[in-house]
UniProtKB/Swiss-Prot annotation:
Protein name: Histidine--tRNA ligase
Database matches in PANTHER family: HISTIDINE--TRNA LIGASE, HISTIDYL-TRNA SYNTHETASE
Annotated localization: Cytoplasm
GO cellular component: cytoplasm
Amino acid sequence: MITPKVLSGFKDRLPKDAIQKAQLLAKVSVVFQSFGFVPIETPHLEYAQTLLPDTSSDIQKEIYRFKDHGDRDVALRFDLTVPLARFVSLHHQILGMPFKRYAIGNVFRGERAQKGRYREFTQCDFDFIGSESLVCDAEIIQVIIASLKALDLEDFCVSINHRKILNGICEYFRISQVNEALRIVDKLEKIGLDGVEEELKKECDLNSNTIKELLEMVQIKQNDLSHAEFFEKIAYLKDYNENLKKGIQDLERLYQLLGDLQISQNLYKIDFSIARGLGYYTGIVYETTLNEMKSLGSVCSGGRYDHLTKNFSKENLQGVGASIGIDRLIVALSEMQLLDERSTQAKVLIACMHEEYFSYANRLAESLRQSGIFSEVYPEAQKIKKPFSYANHRGHEFVAVIGEEEFKSETLSLKNMHSGMQLNCLSFLKALEIIGENDEDL
């Protein structure tokens, strides 16, 4: 006999969990659509050569890669952005530019499993392809904020940086292994200052003084300074080199655009330590954390990638986008008690006291559904205790009971499972009115 078990880093999703996830995805999908983003789908499995170019060594170690039955070198996608580059390169003449897309799907990374981190997890991506305008970057941040607010989250911060600033810092310190250095800096939250310092010494051959000054610079943060105060504070960096100058100027323009959108300044701050470990980012980058649950890591991250399609097409297409980590958000929202705890999406359970009442019960359930109320019929004529126990376990808000009197008069008795109050022999219209009201009204 096979012992039923799940691989580490993977999980089954029970009805309550699956319902919660579906509700969150529905909410963010509405936000994406409200900004004009359209859905696409790409395969879970790609040619390995599609996924590997410009991918950091850390990510490459986490990719699930193998030979398929045709002896082809294939891999499971580790994000939805690289498949997007392949997709756009293949279909750009049909799509037209600029192109705004969102995609929701599972991705796979063989990283160490821990709280909020899985080896299979769902990403919700939204991207703006085919424009280099910073208006697109501002809109992506606007969508991040709107999406989190749609999930009833208010206390969060989008930490923003620019890869040109990081490149400029590396240029200032004459670091030749730029991508390697930034990959290590990106691990600051994970391994701490000492860990980053040790890796920089080992991998980039930097001396202690250079590392100390480098880490001081990449830890520059806006914190409680106003936008104007912070840009005044870092103005001197523009004189160091063109990369730093261009990066800071882009952030100044971005902040002007976000200010025009009247987004609260508490929701976004500059943080020079934000690097994003994926090698394809070239411009503004960002990570979003919940202020009360920073240990969970970023719940939404992304940035600009101006050369992503270079591996697939002679026509270079710019892009900017972000990805919402829905599984991490579920962990956070659960701890905050902001999730629906029911194991059913049906609001009403209809219970029959006798077999001959099922035809009426089914008609009643269909009438409720046509009125927009999800309903189900308990499949057995039982003593009332059993369907009530079922409703309690699943989380139905109401139980409609069909007994002899209700059957003959074509009415129903209705019990509110939250308040415990019951009304007998209601007409369908009266029951419909009550079910549509708040539970407390019964």
